[in-house]
Amino acid sequence: MTIAAGTDDNRQRSTWIWLIACLGVVAIQILTQHLMGRLWICECGYVKLWEGVVNSSGNSQHISDWYTPSHIIHGFLFYGLGYLLLRGKPLSVRLLLATLIESAWEIAENTPMVINRYRSATISLDYFGDSILNSTMDTLAMAAGFLLASRLPVAVTVTIAIVLELFTGWIIRDNLTLNVLMLVWPLDAVKAWQAGL
């Protein structure tokens, strides 16, 4: 065996270790949400691939919905963050950082404090948190966005993010930018515009 072959084997082994660590983070997210009393799936008792009605009891309960693009964009942003902070580190290490951030958000997002903030500051009056399935799929959507950003030119990634933001903003009058704005600094004008859907 050559030195190069041994180095490749070590690199592959290291990649697998980091990927298993990512899965471990997702497993901890799932367990934590279960211990928080979150429902596994929609209270309706079935699972849908897509929930297209934003103001419904099924929103944030199924595999994907209009907020899935926001989580893909999280992946784009976390890839950029990892590139800036951990430039010399392998992609799998940066993916672990992204997974830790996303999982921490998914847990925080489903606490009573954040759920109540959504209900009071945004148009999400009927929001009662994500199902564990939906939250897990949000984390996987982030990972997909992260991996996509790692393969695409920056200009293409930025273009996709802008298109996703504009499209969801047009269709449901909400997107990642508006969501963050309304959580951090709610504007009555934006809330009134969103309510006009």
From Swiss-Prot:
The chain crosses the membrane at residues 16-36, 66-86, 152-172. It comes from the Bacteria. It is a multi-pass membrane protein. The keyword tRNA processing does not apply. One of its GO terms (cellular component) is plasma membrane. It is found in: Cell membrane. Keywords: Cell membrane, Membrane, Transmembrane, Transmembrane helix. Belongs to the UPF0314 family. This is UPF0314 protein NGR_c32320. It comes from Sinorhizobium fredii (strain NBRC 101917 / NGR234).
